[in-house]
Curated annotation (Swiss-Prot):
The keyword Transferase applies. It catalyses: 7-aminomethyl-7-carbaguanine + guanosine(34) in tRNA = 7-aminomethyl-7-carbaguanosine(34) in tRNA + guanine. Homodimer. Within each dimer, one monomer is responsible for RNA recognition and catalysis, while the other monomer binds to the replacement base PreQ1. GO terms for molecular function: metal ion binding; tRNA-guanosine(34) queuine transglycosylase activity. This is Queuine tRNA-ribosyltransferase. Keywords: Glycosyltransferase, Metal-binding, Queuosine biosynthesis, Transferase, tRNA processing, Zinc. Substrate binds at residues 99-103, 153, 198, 225. InterPro entries: ArchSynthase1/Queuine_TRR (IPR050076), TGT (IPR004803), TGT-like_sf (IPR036511), tRNA_ribo_trans-like (IPR002616).
């Protein structure tokens, strides 16, 4: 099946296959093609920490994520505009998704004030007063020339009462309408615009948020407000019902998630796109994802271990260095430890999603899931019930 998402958008989405709820798809964007399910490395400040652009290409990343909030504050729009956009500034010629800055603004807590017009906050860099609104967020992301633009929304905190979550999502819906109007009608931006579903842990509010976004109409839909401190059982509960209600012909993006197991479970429930800082952050702390689970390289048992980090991995780190060497680098506090670890962890995530795509193409996704958990010594969680 093939769909043109929106006559005003240059993005196309094609669903290539399905196993249960799991989907194999393809996104065509202004800067290239993205095969889904996909994991997007996070490049908050215009760089994936510890990685050269050529390293990101070598791990076979298809698309990366940038942060509107941080890039707006530093280096600022003028510098990026002088370079002709974020792609040229950071020397990355493949697709980029930028979040709107909403999550970062609302994580400032008492440092920000929310009004209907937008949010006023103190810059965490120099303390100056900054105002961010749906319209300004759209203008920033146009200067960045993001292939996928995210709407400016309020990320519902956890925990939140039903009343608090409803008030928050209704503000986000009003902002979503303003985002679309400004993106399409004022800016004439043909890059993709995604809506973000909020509503906390309440199914009726998630429905209200989704239905409101559908009335406005977006090129894709993201699930926000998860991985914000809720128990995993709560996250799975939302994923059990929400993706199945989202449009079949548009990409589904789970924001900020997460662990390899979370990605597998979300794919089983119909999600297509993921991002998370976990692989890079864990690498800087000596925690490496491997086929059989997790290696904490600072453990003294690796001091004489001459095996590669993961014998199943084809990354630069695993093809050239032993666990003993990585242990040595960590104990010495060498910068190279986090660099080699980041290369490996991000390649692991790319191999994971590539394996999922291959299994979906070959009709062996159930076997893939069983093998994934068996290698970790874990029981296979129940499949979602349709």
């Amino acid at each position: 099946m093939f769909f043109r998402l929106d006559l005003e958008s240059c993005m196309k989405f094609e669903k290539l296959g399905q196993s249960g709820r799991a989907r194999r798809g393809r996104l065509t964007l202004a800067h290239g093609v993205v095969e889904t399910p996909v994991f997007m490395p996070v490049g908050t400040y215009g760089t994936v920490k510890g990685m050269l652009p050529r390293d990101i290409e070598e791990i076979q990343a298809q698309i990366i994520l940038g942060n509107t909030f941080h890039l707006y504050l530093r280096p600022g729009l003028e510098v990026i505009k002088e370079h002709g956009g974020l792609h040229e500034f950071i020397k990355w010629d493949k697709p980029i998704l930028t979040d709107s800055g909403g999550f970062q603004v609302f994580s400032l807590g008492a440092m920000r004030k929310i009004k209907e017009e937008g949010v006023t906050f103190r810059s965490p860099i120099d303390g100056s007063k900054v105002f961010l609104s749906p319209e300004i967020s759209m203008e920033i992301q146009q200067v960045l020339n993001s292939d996928i633009v995210m709407i400016f929304d309020e990320c519902t905190p956890y925990p939140a009462t039903h009343e608090e979550a409803q008030k928050s999502l209704q503000l986000s819906l009003r902002w979503a309408k303003r985002c679309k109007t400004h993106h399409h009608e004022q800016l004439n931006n043909t890059n993709a615009l995604f809506g973000i579903i909020q509503g906390g842990m309440y199914e009726d509010l998630r429905d209200e948020s989704l239905n409101g976004l559908l009335e406005i109409g977006f090129d894709g839909y993201a699930i926000g407000g998860l991985s914000v401190g809720e128990p995993k059982e709560e996250m799975i509960k939302v994923l059990d019902y929400l993706p199945a209600k989202m449009p079949e012909d548009k990409p589904r993006y789970l924001m900020g998630v997460g662990k390899p197991e979370d990605i597998v479970e979300a794919v089983r429930r119909g999600v297509d796109m993921f991002d998370c800082v976990m692989p890079t952050r864990n690498a800087r702390n000596g925690h490496y994802f491997v086929t059989d689970g997790l290696v904490r390289i600072r453990n003294s048992k690796y001091r004489h271990d001459q095996s590669p980090l993961d014998p199943h991995c084809d990354c630069y780190t695993c093809k050239n260095f032993t666990r003993a060497y990585l242990y040595h680098l960590e104990k010495c506090g060498e910068m190279l430890a986090s660099m080699l670890g980041t290369i490996h962890n991000l390649r692991y995530y790319q191999r994971l999603t590539q394996g999922i795509r291959d299994a979906l193409e070959q009709g062996t996704f159930d076997e893939f899931v069983t093998d994934f958990y068996t290698r970790r010594g874990l029981d296979v969680p129940p499949a979602p019930v349709d």
